[in-house]
Amino acid sequence: MSSQKKVSSGNTTPSGLAGLASPLNDQQINLLQQISDLSPQQLAWVSGYFWGLSQSAAPSAVTPIAQAVSAVAAKPAGKLTIIFASQTGNAKGVAEALEQEAKAEGIAVQLFDASDYKGKNLANETHVIIVASTNGEGEAPDNAIELHEFLQSKKAPKLPNLQYGVIGLGDSSYEFFCQTGKDFDSYLAKLGATPFIERVDCDVDYDASAAQWRKQALEKVKDALSAGVEADVVQLPVAQLAAGHALYTKQKPYAATLLTSQKITGRDSGKDVRHVEIDLAGSGITYQPGDALGVWFENSGELANQVLAKVGLSGVESVDVDGESLSIHSALVSKFEITSSNPQQVEKFAQLSGSKKLLKLVEEKDKLREYAGNTQLVDLLAEKQTKLTAEELVGLLRRLTPRLYSIASSQTEVDEEVHLTVGLVEYDVKGEKRFGGASGYLAQRLEEGEQVKVFVENNNNFKLPADDNVPVIMVGPGTGIAPFRSFIQERDNRGAEGKNWLFFGDRTFTQDFLYQVEWQKYLKSGLLTKLDVAFSRDQAEKVYVQQRILENAAQVWQWIQEGAYLYVCGDANRMAKDVHQAFVAVAEQEGKMSRDDAEEFINDLRKAKRYQRDVY
C-alpha cells in the first residue's frame, strides 16, 4: 500500500485517516496530528475519551480534540491498572472505590474484571493492584480462575518492571483465609515483580481496613506515576461515568418495604423456609436474574440483653461508634455482629476471661475454627462469667455486615418488587433457641409494612446465556432454588426457546418441595423441559441431586454437547463439591475421557462461563 498522504477538500489528513473524507478543519487536523507520537496506552485513552464525548449531547466551549490532546500531552505516561477477582461483588466494590479515589488524586487508572484481563499484558504494566476475594476452600473466584492458573503456568512472563499491591478479602473463620490474595502476591513475586506496598488481608468487616490500605497505596502510586507535569484529569461525560452505576449501594441502601414473609415449607417440616416479597416501587432499582439482594438487618433486642447480662452490663452504658454516642444496647442491635463468633473473638475472650478451656482451644487451630463456626457470642461469653466494660465488649465484636440473598424473581415478571427465598437458621443450645441474624430478622421480627434497608449486588459470574436458544441445566437443592425461579421467569417472559432442566432436592416431597405448584405449571406448559428431584428422607436410602445427575448421565452429556450452560446454587461445603464430581464423572463416562481430562473439560466449561456457581 502506498504511504502517500491523500489530499481531500483542501485538508491534509494524518496517514491513519488516508482515504477518508475528513469533516475536520485545518486547525483540528493540526491538533490531531499531535497524537501521532503517543504510546498505545495513550491512544487507547484518547479513543475512549472521544467515544465518551460522542455519546454526550452537552456542548463545550473547548474543542474536544484540543482538550484531549492537551490533557494527554500533560499526563505522565504511567497508569494504574486495577484488577478485581470477585465472587459476590465485595472485591469489585473495593476495586471500584479505589478507581474513583485514584481519579480524584489525578492518577491515570483503568479497571478490569479478572475474566477480561489477559495475563500476558502484565509484562507491559508498571503498576498493578489486585483486589481478590477467596471462594470455597481457598479457590479463586470464578472470574479469576484463568488468570490464577496462567500466573502459575510456564506461559507467564517475567515481570521485573512491574510494581504491584494486593488486597485480599476473606473470612478468618475459614482455614484458607484470603488464600487467593496470598496466591496472587506469591505468583507475582516469583515472576520478578516488586510489591510497592505490603499485602493486606481483610476480614468480613473489611470496610475500614480496606479504606486505610487504599489511601496508603494511592499515596505511594501517586508519587511514582506523577513524575511529569500534573494536569487536571479529563473525565468522561458524567452520563458515561454513571452508566450502570447503582442508585443505591451497600453504603447507601434503599429503605424498601416488606410486603410479605410467607412460610413455604409444611407444618411438619424440620425447616422454616420463607418466601419474602419486598416492594421497590419508586426506587428506580433494577436487577438481573443471578444478582443478589443485600439486606441490612437489626439484631434481636432480647439477644442483646442476654449478651449484656453475661458481662454484667445494664445496656445504658455509652459507647462511641463512628463518632456517634450510642447506648451499648443500641450498638449491639444495630452496629455489631452478635449472632456468630470467630477465632479472633474466641482468642480475645480467652485472654480476658482466663478460661482454661478456651485458652487450650486457642492452641488447636482446627478445633478453634470448628468451635467458632458453631458458637454464638452469647454462648462464648457463657464459658466463663466475666465482667467487661462496654468498651471491652465492643472490642470483641465485628461490625455488622449485610447478608446477601440470591434473588428469586425476574423484574419481567414482578416489576418493582424483589423476591427472596430465606431459610431460617434455627438450632438449640442447652435447651435454648438460637436464630440467625438476618434470617431471624426477615422471618420473625420484621412486620409486613415495615422498612428494610436493601441494595442490589450484581453478580456477573451467574448469568443466563445471552442466546435464548441455548439449553440450561440448573442444580439447586434447598434454598439454592432461588435464582432458578428468577431464571425461569425471565426465560418465560423473553419467550426463550432454549430447553430448561431443573434438579431440585430437599428432605421430603410433602413438606419441603419449594415452589412445587410453580414448577409443575412450568413443566406442564413445556417451558421446563425436564424436572428431576431427590428427597433424601422419603426412602430408607438417602438420595441427593448428584445421584440424579449420574442417573441421567447420557442425557446430561447430550445437553452439554448441544451447548448447555450448567448452573449450581446452594451449599458450598458438600453439595457443590459432590455435584462438581458428578459432572466430572459424566464427562469421564459419556465422553470416554480419563479422569484428569474430564476434570480439565469441566474446568474449561467454567472458564468459558458455561459452568457457573453461586455457592455459600
Swiss-Prot record:
Signal peptide: none annotated. Residues 251-465 form the FAD-binding FR-type domain. FMN binds at residues 86-91, 133-136, 169-178. Binds 1 FAD per subunit. Binds 1 FMN per subunit. It catalyses: hydrogen sulfide + 3 NADP(+) + 3 H2O = sulfite + 3 NADPH + 4 H(+). Its cofactor is FAD; FMN. GO terms for biological process: cysteine biosynthetic process; hydrogen sulfide biosynthetic process; sulfate assimilation. NADP(+) binds at residues 536-537, 542-546, 578. Keywords: Amino-acid biosynthesis, Cysteine biosynthesis, Electron transport, FAD, Flavoprotein, FMN, NADP, Oxidoreductase, Transport. One of its GO terms (molecular function) is sulfite reductase (NADPH) activity. One of its GO terms (cellular component) is cytosol. Its EC number is 1.8.1.2. FAD binds at residues 339, 373, 403-406, 421-423, 427, 436-439, 616. SUPFAM superfamilies: Ferredoxin reductase-like, C-terminal NADP-linked domain (SSF52343), Flavoproteins (SSF52218), Riboflavin synthase domain-like (SSF63380). Pathway: Sulfur metabolism; hydrogen sulfide biosynthesis; hydrogen sulfide from sulfite (NADPH route): step 1/1. The keyword Lyase does not apply. Residues 80-218 form the Flavodoxin-like domain. The keyword RNA-binding does not apply. Gene3D superfamilies: 3.40.50.360, NADPH-cytochrome p450 Reductase, Chain A, domain 3 (1.20.990.10), Nucleotide-binding domain of ferredoxin-NADP reductase (FNR) module (3.40.50.80), Translation factors (2.40.30.10). It holds the Pfam family NAD_binding_1. It comes from the Bacteria. Alpha(8)-beta(8). The alpha component is a flavoprotein, the beta component is a hemoprotein. Belongs to the NADPH-dependent sulphite reductase flavoprotein subunit CysJ family. Component of the sulfite reductase complex that catalyzes the 6-electron reduction of sulfite to sulfide. This is one of several activities required for the biosynthesis of L-cysteine from sulfate. The flavoprotein component catalyzes the electron flow from NADPH -> FAD -> FMN to the hemoprotein component. This is Sulfite reductase [NADPH] flavoprotein alpha-component. It comes from Vibrio vulnificus (strain CMCP6). The gene is cysJ.
